[in-house]
Regions:
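Short beta->alpha junction loops
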Residues: 62-71
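Bacterial N-terminal signal peptides
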Residues: 5-14
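Short glycine-rich His-centered loop
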Residues: 21-37
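Active-site-proximal C-terminal subdomain of hydrolase catalytic domains
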Residues: 28, 138, 142, 146, ...
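Signal peptide-proximal N-terminal region
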Residues: 48-61
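Boundary at the C-terminal end of the N-terminal hydrophobic targeting segment
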Residues: 17-19
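Caspase-like (clan CD) cysteine peptidase catalytic core
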Residues: 21, 60, 73-96, 101-175, ...
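Glycine- and acidic-residue-enriched helix-capping/strand-helix junction motifs
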Residues: 32-47, 217-222
């Protein structure tokens, strides 16, 4: 009886991180409505990441790929996700696509720039058709994720992976024949002035493909480096501490893809001292 009790306790210990429903929203964009954006392969990432998540117990899964991944559709899916969440749920959000710096209108960034995800219908330059309202800036992303956090409570796990790049302060150009996610030019919004706003707290974990001064280069097969690492290493990442997980992904970067003179390293931000990104993965025998 004692042996059975110990086994039950260990099983419960392994599953404790996965209480509640496991939900996910995956967004991937390759070709954009505005031809000024370079063709990338974020759409391929989306299906690969979705498959990896299903293998790790995410049954409530929404995928937005290509032209359906407009700004309005992404916001709507975030709102649906938040509305369905319950206390203790595990929620995962993934974005593969272009990123861009844009004028920080509300003044919460010391450098004057917001980072943004680029939906399918966003334009690369400020114009009458897009004055910035089609970009998904970090303030909006924060508000959408905060709504999810409020629903799942402090017992829930909220993890985000971003296989994009902003490269706003990088002056180095990528090597020839290398596909890079992100652009050098920022989206400049004319403004008569900015007021100062408090920087919002990041109440989740965000795993990004590279640091904000680095380029995010695709692998030769078109896969995003971070997406490929997560899908390939999923079985090895379960249970790792955050620094160990970052080391594993860095090793994958170094082993795979074209040999490049431009370094790229993953980075994790948010509640790294109290939560583990690896808890999204299920331990396998």
């Amino acid at each position: 009886m004692k042996k059975i009790a110990v086994i039950l306790f260990l099983n419960a210990l392994c599953l404790c991180s996965f209480a509640g429903t496991r939900r996910a929203l995956v967004i991937g964009i390759g070709e954009y409505e505005d031809p000024a954006w370079e063709r990338i392969h974020g759409d391929r990432d989306a299906w690969a990441v979705a498959g990896m998540l299903r293998e790790n117990g995410f049954r409530n899964l929404s995928v937005l790929v290509g032209r359906v991944a407009t700004k309005a559709a992404i916001v709507a899916q975030f709102e649906l996700l938040a509305g369905r969440c319950e206390t203790g749920d595990t929620v995962y959000v993934h974005f593969s696509g272009h990123g861009q710096l844009m004028t920080d209108v509300d003044g919460d960034e010391s450098d004057g720039w917001d980072e943004s995800w680029i939906p399918y219908d966003a334009c690369r330059k400020y114009c009458p058709r897009d004055r910035g309202e089609r970009h998904l800036c970090d303030d909006e992303i924060n508000a959408l994720l905060t709504s999810v956090r409020e629903r799942i409570g402090e017992d829930g796990l909220l993890a985000v992976s971003v296989d994009a790049c902003h490269a706003g302060d990088s002056t180095r150009r990528p090597e020839q024949n290398t596909v890079v996610r992100g652009v050098y030019d920022g989206f400049v919004i004319p403004s008569s002035g900015r007021h100062r706003a408090a920087r919002r707290r990041e109440r989740w974990l965000t795993l990004s493909a590279c640091r904000d001064y680095q380029l995010n280069q695709e692998l030769p097969d078109g896969s995003g480096r971070l997406s490929a690492a997560l899908c390939t290493l999923a079985a090895e990442l379960c249970g790792l501490e955050n620094d160990e997980l970052l080391a594993k992904i860095s090793e994958f970067y170094n082993r795979n893809g074209a040999r490049s003179r431009l370094p790229q390293a993953p980075i994790m931000t948010g509640e790294t001292d109290i939560r583990r990104f690896s808890d999204i993965f299920v331990k396998r025998d």
